[in-house]
Amino acid sequence: MDLPVGPGAAGPSNVPAFLTKLWTLVSDPDTDALICWSPSGNSFHVLDQGQFAKEVLPKYFKHSNMASFVRQLNMYGFRKVVHIEQGGLVKPERDDTEFQHPCFLRGQEQLLENIKRKVTSVSTLRSEDIKIRQDSVTKLLTDVQLMKGKQESMDSKLLAMKHENEALWREVASLRQKHAQQQKVVNKLIQFLISLVQSNRILGVKRKIPLMLNDGGPAHPMPKYGRQYSLEHIHGPGPYPAPSPAYSGSSLYSPDAVTSSGPIISDITELAPGSPVASSGGSVDERPLSSSPLVRVKEEPPSPPQSPRAEGASPGRPSSMVETPLSPTTLIDSILRESEPTPVASTTPLVDTGGRPPSPLPASAPEKCLSVACLDKTELSDHLDAMDSNLDNLQTMLTSHGFSVDTSTLLDLFSPSVTVPDMSLPDLDSSLASIQELLSPQEPPRPLEAEKSSPDSGKQLVHYTAQPLLLLDPGSVDVGSSDLPVLFELGEGSYFSEGDDYSDDPTISLLTGSEPPKAKDPTVS
């Protein structure tokens, strides 16, 4: 800010008014007590700043502020000279401030033109600053836009992951439910298969090629059952009480009946050729039977009447009711088939009392047979093959990956309420009643002589069916029961005595197990 020039001031016109006023003020001898040149003439001194500000500054400038005067000096390039004594901690006694400029010299007023005011390029600085700031703002906006795009991308990815997570959780829940249902189905299948295995274990299932009794051919192995029951009779009194009155008319299964031999009936599934059996009797008894395969059963010839065993037989019981060893399954199955009234003749085989092997019979005699219904080998084999094929197909379907199961149908099919033990089996009381009916006498007993003289002796019919029956466990049967006195005591003793010689008869040797073992046929499974 230029001040008006004081009195006595003169200078070129291009010199700033502040410099002109300063030159006049320093050169005025009236103000030497407050401001004057230095002895060298290169600078000037301000002796008392307070008094100078009050008395001198208002005369030349429009203010009395010492700080403003110093700021103007600095704007024109004047610098404050600092002495050594002024740089200490102790305040100097004299208030003296010295300012100097290279072009402000005593006696050289023309140099004032060289003193220029410092021009501050405010506009340039502002434009550069604004440019820098604009670049920074642009870069910042670019970064913000990039960050915003990344944030939107992350939001979209997060939303997609959220949807995928929800879908995965729904799939996991569905898979868990399907897994639980499949576990239930598998458990039902396992229970069903276990029940089948248990039922097959209880049933007396035979091999594919069981034995048929033949006359003179090579002996076959005995039929194999799930449980082996001995067919030997017990000599002497048994552990069971006396039979009920329903058994009084027959000596079959009587504990005190003494016999050594008799016809043996065994069910077979294949008819093997054998030599015909001749007998001195008449023709074969032709009675109506169901359409079933026939099985040949060897019949012993009548023995001479002077046998001591025949004479020692009980006179109260006819010889036609002599005990005959039968298979328990054959007997019970044949009884259960008797739901319809069918004429069944009582078995009246003759007893071989000679204690010797039977004499050879003439080959020209007519063949005598007993008709027994039995399963055919091919039917049984086809049935077993079909069961194996069904089990293999079931296993293949369960192990395949693309197999879908209707759980509702399977759960209804394999419910625990439908098991093998729930099958409708014949009641024990009705079975026992049928046994008593069968064992009751069908006709009045005839004397021994009339039985021997009858031409139809030894031609009785036995009705048999191959229906499977669940056998009872001998250990679970009460020993004191008198309903079935012989079914579970067959294995306690030998049917034939040790003194009898039946080594030549293959049929009796098969029942006693005295025949030497033979080489196993490789075709027999």
From Swiss-Prot:
Region (Hydrophobic repeat HR-A/B): 130-203
Region (Disordered), start-end ranges: 266-365, 495-525
Covalent cross-link Glycyl lysine isopeptide (Lys-Gly) (interchain with G-Cter in SUMO), where: K298
Cross-referenced PROSITE patterns: HSF_DOMAIN
Low complexity biased stretches: 272-283
Region (Transactivation domain): 367-525
Species per Swiss-Prot/TrEMBL record: Bos taurus
Protein name (Swiss-Prot/TrEMBL): Heat shock factor protein 1
Family: Belongs to the HSF family.
Residue numbers of Phosphothreonine PTMs: T142, T324
UniProt modified residues of type Phosphoserine: S121, S230, S275, S292, S303, S307, S314, S319, S320, S327, S346, S359, S415, S440
Stored SUPFAM superfamilies: Winged helix' DNA-binding domain
